[in-house]
Structures are given as structure tokens and as C-alpha cells.
């Protein structure tokens, strides 16, 4: 055993003083002093349980003692009689065994591979032990779940990630997926339950038993987000549902995650074999699949962006050359060739590395370096986490913990440890880049083109100076460019830029100026880019991004030249610069039906319990997607209808995620309303009105929302802090509003307007579906029925969605007096015009003026309300373009008129989109769009002016 270093020997005195009476420096073995000096977690544990220290002193932990964990836990649970005592025993058992593992690891009594095995087996033992106890308890309460033939159904648990691979780290959370085989009902209990309900309740109790903090701590943080559909999907799925999902919808990243999936309990029963056989074809393709490399490259890019976003420095997991890159290297070979090479199908990394070497897929020296780096990094990670039982991969900044790690890694001092770490990570990065990396580099031609601009940047030319590279610019433009450069340099003098930042900036600016100043609009473009540069000069990582990736720099220049809105967004949120790295995604927005899945994958990297990071991640995702939509709009690859479609699908994905976050937080606090115990879903819906309801969102649109529930009276929640069910839904809606409007460093998510709810701002924030129907039928004004034409459910249970759709259809198909309706719609339009009148009389307000967008919307709404009782099909859509289509199809409006109004409508909306990209108000010269305006005004007179 290595003696304690000098700083640790001094700290040891403090440790001894904290121990209970009976423990003195002389009574402690050298081993005990070393472990307790190294790990505050071990020290706190033996202070609370001195008998554990005596146990360790008398008999050291053994390498194979993991084989006894199940038996030891069975003994510990023998006296458990309820969930509370189960939770206590699980927590104490986990802590006792973790102290033993920390002891063995710190003193190197057991090799590092075995430590990973012990940590994984401990987690598996606790999961299986808790599941089995709770399964029996649930069966006593509700009966045994059976298939139609009466065969009992088990709960199968897939351990994902490092747990599945047998490589769990010291303070890891656990990723799980729950499944059961076949549908059916419980038998033999006090009351029958559908199998789905039984297993959902069992799953909820199991998560609580493992995850909920008590006075004894928690067992493991449980993350269920890898299951199909993530948090918005069922907690437990049948085999049939799992198979359907992975065959029809499984994404690449889910395939990679499934490589390490392992059934907890290592059962070899028929159900377990069936589940393994079902999943294998999804994970390992029969053919050699080289598309994996680009997919993994994209995933690595996402992680690199996350490191930049969150400012993760000295991160041995996610940083360049870290643990994640070794995992990616191994997964490349597993996913490309695993279908044909069974030896590559191992869940564990080190055996797979051996297979890669045996198949000669990597040079022997590379494999040896990766193995050494992996074991070095995993030991360092585990030691780091065992200091405080804390889930971290970031190297410490304080002297004590640095001294601890240096000693634990058998280095003379901290600099020596950092040197060894740097060498290992450099070896990993080299192999990773050769296999997966795609770093760009400047061509010799680029360097030659940029060289003359070095003089412009470094010599600080004056306004009246002349230089050949600026000769092509007009005098005024040349003066503006030189002034901008000079002003930017003055601004830099006020900023605390380090030597590395200066070096990167001096490397970047000649390339940037060469690209900007070759343009005719050089002065305008440079004026938009310099504020962005001023904002990132103290964040060297972003300067390096632009310097090292010439393609990203070119896209930055092109987008800033095209749109001041994009330039402003990039300046405000520099993390968006990451989006410029891949032109394939930059100008190709996410598929309209894939926003939810992309967001789900994005949020998986953020701890579920970290509300602040979750809020940031939502905002960052939205901004990145907005940038991609705007880039495609500018490039002309998205027509106006598609721009709005994408903005609307993005908003719906955001609503879905916000409701999920709010729901999770509320249920953790109060439990869920008891009426949901007997059914699937949440009994809650979000209805989108206006531009959201009509699929017509713009870049800066707010969201018009109302909230509905179907909670009966006198229902309470089932949590420890009981509240009235309707109060729960009110607080849920308030929480949703809060999550949307909270301002973080990345801004707000959306402005939300809930005033279209029954009784407006004076009404309840959330309304029961029955009360909503009653209000619409007996109290709502005509303008509220107009608003309903453009309303649809954007989040909600199928049951509530159907209920809302029925109310909407009933209201719109109500027979109305034509003259009265015409008068009321026309008068409402005149009131709006008076209230929102154009302040620029010499300009045409595209939205509000006569012949503008709002007139077209009112014409469509009027005709639906006027004729839907005769033609119910008019109620099908909530967007103006398809409503105009329906009016023509149903013989209400002449087809030529409907097409002409549609063209006018899309033309005007297209102009609004482009004005927004230029950060210009929504009005133009009076001479613009005269043809469209005349056509709309003629249609208005035809339908809405009394005759």
C-alpha cells in the first residue's frame, strides 16, 4: 500500500478527530486511515455505523464477494413488512456495500475491472430484490397478472448503459426499461386490474423505492427516459408494444443504447429468451452498416456542443479523448459488423476491445492504448466519485481533492497525474479522429487568400489609409469597413482576453475579413458580425470553432449578411454557432414529425432532476431549430407554408416537453389525481388558438393557449401531500405558464397568452371540459366562436381531444342568422381596426389594414360559421388555406376566388416572414401588393358588406 502523501497525512489528523469514541490513531490500521482520509463518503458512513469499520478491519473485502450480494440482501429484507421499511433496508444495504467497494478500490485490493463488476452487480441485486418484494406485495393487493391462458406474467427490467454492460461507475444513476409479456388481467386479488395498470403501479412503486430521497438517502437515481416515447410514453410496455415501436419507429441512437441492454436477474426463462430474441435484429443488422459512422459522428458533435454549452472543463467523460470517445470507437465496430461477428456483440467494452483486436479491426498498439486509457479513466472516475458519493466527471480545483486523486492514482503529485491523463486522452483522441473525426482544415489557397488581410487586421489602418485588398470597395464602404475594424479593436481593449484568445483571434480575423470584404455588402455584413465577435472574445472555445472550421465561418457570414435577425440571435446566444458546423442539418430543418423525438434525445443528456438545466436545454433546442428553419427559409428551400408548419411542429414539441416537466414536478409533490388510477393518460389537454391552432406561426409569434381537464368533483390526489384534483390541474397550468415564461440566460421559451379561455382573464386558468362546452353553447360571443374556428388540441389524451373536437363541431355547425352573423363579424373587424389602427398612414400594414391578412381570416371564419350547419365538412381544418380549399370543394366559394385568396394570403405571409428576418416592422409602401389588396377587398365586400 502506498503511504499517504504529506498533505493527506496532515489531513488524517482531522479525520481521526471526527471518529466516535473508541477509535484512536493507534487503534486504526494504516488501511483504515488511508481509506477514511481519502473518502468523505466512507468516513461519514463509518461515523454513522461504526460496526462497519470493525467488520472491514477484521476481514478485508474480497474480489468475488459480489456472488454473496443476493444472499446478504435476502437476509436484510427478511423482516421487511411495508414499503417504508423496504426503502430503509435497501438504502442501508447499498451504503454498507458501497463502503466495502470504496475500501477495496482505494487500497487496490481488487483490480479495476472487478470493481466495475461489483458496482454493477450491487445495483442489479438491489433492483431485482426490490422488484421481487414489491411484485409479491402488489399481487397480494390486486392479484397476480396473467395472460388469457392464466399464465402469470413477470415484470422484466432491461438495464441500459453502463449498468447493462456491467461497467457501472461509483455514483451513477441507472437507466431502466420496464416490460411485461402479454395483455390480460390480474387474478386472485381483492379486485381485478388490467395488466397494464398492474405493471404501471408496480413500476411506480419500484422507482419510488429506489429513487426517492429519505433520511437514509436514496438507492439510485432512476432514469426511465430511454423507454419508447420517453417520458410521454407508457412507463411499462408489453412485448408487442416494444416490438412494434422498435420495428417501426426505433431511431439510430436508440439502437446504440440497446447494444448494452441486459435483463436484470440474468433469467433464462422463456419470457426472457423471447424478449432478447425480439430485440436482437433491431440492434445488430445482418448486413455491414457503414451509416453508423456518420450517426455516431453526429452524436459526438452533439456531445461536444453540450460540453461547450455547459462550460464543462476538465471533464474526463465527455471531453476530447474521454471515456465517451472510447465507447464510441468500440460501438462503431459493434454496430457496423456486429450482425456478422458474434464476438462483437458483447455488452461490455473490454471484451469487445479484445474481439476488435482478434479480428484485426484496429492495430494492436491502438487497442492496447485504448484499454490502458479506459482502465485509467474509469479508475480516476470512480475514485473521484467515491470521495463524496457524487456523480461527477469533472476534475477538482481544490488542493485536498487533487492530493487525494494523485495518491489514489499512484502519482507523485497532481502535475504528474495530469500529465499521465493528458497522454491517455491524446491517444484516445488520435484513434477517435482517425476513425470518426471529421475536422476541417484550411486549404493552402485559403491561407494565401487570407494573408493580405493580416495587414488590415494587425496594423490597425486608419480611415484614410489605402490598401490593395480594399481597393474594390467604394470610398464610403471602405471607410465604414476600416471604422468598424478600428472600433472593434478598441472594444477588444476593454475585454479581459487571455493570450490564447488573442492568438486564436489573430488567426481567425484575416480569414473572416477575406470572406466578408470580398462581398458587395461588406460594410453591412461586418457591422452585423462584429457584435457577435465582441460577445465571444472571452470564450475561446467559440473563437476556435470559427477558426478551425472554415465552413462554419462561411455559413456565419452568409446568414448574417442575409438576416439581421439571425445575426442578433447568434450574438445573443453564441451556443448557436455549433449549428453552423453541419450544412447538412443547417439548411435542412428537422422533419416535421420528428421534432418531439429530436427534443427527447436532446433532453436525455440533461439530468431529469436538474430543473434549471432542463429549462436551459428547452430554450437552446428551440433557438437551434429556429436558426435551422430561418437558414432554410433564406436559402429558399422552405416555402412559406412549410416555414409555418415547421415553426408550429416545433412549438408543439415544446408544449409536449413543458407539460411533461410540469406534470413530473407536480406529481412528485402531490401525487396524481385519483381518477387516473383507473385509466390511461393524464386527463389534461392544451388547446392551441390563433396562429398555433391554424398552423401559421411566425418567427416571433406568441402562443394562444387554453387548458382543459376532465377531473370530477371531490377527487383528491394520491400523494403524501393530498390536494383537491381540480386544484392540482390549476397548479399544473400555472406551472406550465411559469416554465414557458421563466427568463434564463437563454431567454424565455414563448410568450403565452391564455386570455381566450372562457370569461377571458377573469376566468379560471384551467377549465373542465364540461364547463368549456357549457360556456361555448350558452355564454360565448360570436368573436369567441370565430376564434374556435382556428382552434385544435395540441397536447392531450385521445378522450379529451375527442371531447373538444365534438364541442367545436357542435358550435360551428349551429345554424345562425346570416344577417346577424354578418353584422357581428364585420363590426368586430371594424373595432379591431379602430383599436389596432395603422399608425403609419403612408404605409400598408400587411396584417391589420384593409385588404390584409386579417380580412382573409375573417372571411374564412365567417363562411365556416355561416354554412357549416349545411356543410359539416367545413369544420375539418383549422388553418385558413385548407378552409378556403374546403369552401371551394363544398360549393360555398367559387374555386377561382378561393385560389386567388389563397395566393394573396400566402404571398402576404411570406412577406411578413421575410420582414421578420430583416428585423423590419410588418408594413410596406402603399404601392405594394395593390393587386392582392384589391382582390381581398372585393371578396370582403362580396361576403361581409350588407346588401
Curated annotation (Swiss-Prot):
The text of the family note is: Belongs to the GlnE family.
Q: Which NCBIfam families did the record assign?
A: PRK11072.1
According to the record, the residues making up region (Adenylyl removase) are 1-440
Instruction: State the name under which the record lists this protein.
Output: Bifunctional glutamine synthetase adenylyltransferase/adenylyl-removing enzyme
What does the UniProt keyword field contain?
Answer: ATP-binding, Magnesium, Multifunctional enzyme, Nucleotide-binding, Nucleotidyltransferase, Transferase
Among its keywords, does the record have Nucleotidyltransferase? Answer: yes
| Reaction(s) catalysed (UniProt annotation) | [glutamine synthetase]-O(4)-(5'-adenylyl)-L-tyrosine + phosphate = [glutamine synthetase]-L-tyrosine + ADP; [glutamine synthetase]-L-tyrosine + ATP = [glutamine synthetase]-O(4)-(5'-adenylyl)-L-tyrosine + diphosphate
Q: Which Pfam families match?
A: GlnD_UR_UTase (PF08335), GlnE (PF03710)
Enzyme class, top EC level, equals transferase
Q: Does the keyword ATP-binding apply?
A: yes
Q: Which GO terms describe its molecular function?
A: [glutamate-ammonia-ligase] adenylyltransferase activity; [glutamine synthetase]-adenylyl-L-tyrosine phosphorylase activity; ATP binding; magnesium ion binding
- EC numbers on record: 2.7.7.89, 2.7.7.42
Q: Name one GO cellular component term.
A: cytosol
Q: Which cofactor does it need?
A: Mg(2+)
The UniProt entry, under InterPro entries, shows: GlnE (IPR023057), GlnE_rpt_dom (IPR005190), NT_sf (IPR043519), PII_UdlTrfase/GS_AdlTrfase (IPR013546)
Instruction: Cite the residue spans of the region called Adenylyl transferase.
Output: 450-947
- The organism encoding this protein is Salmonella paratyphi A (strain AKU_12601)
Residue ranges that the Swiss-Prot or TrEMBL entry lists as coiled coil: none
Function description: Involved in the regulation of glutamine synthetase GlnA, a key enzyme in the process to assimilate ammonia. When cellular nitrogen levels are high, the C-terminal adenylyl transferase (AT) inactivates GlnA by covalent transfer of an adenylyl group from ATP to specific tyrosine residue of GlnA, thus reducing its activity. Conversely, when nitrogen levels are low, the N-terminal adenylyl removase (AR) activates GlnA by removing the adenylyl group by phosphorolysis, increasing its activity.
Could you give a single Gene Ontology term from the biological process aspect? regulation of glutamine family amino acid metabolic process
List the Gene3D superfamilies: 1.20.120.1510, Beta Polymerase, domain 2, Glutamine synthase adenylyltransferase GlnE, Nucleotidyltransferases domain 2
Q: Where are the transmembrane segments?
A: none
The record ties this protein, via HAMAP family, to: GlnE
Gene name of this polypeptide: glnE
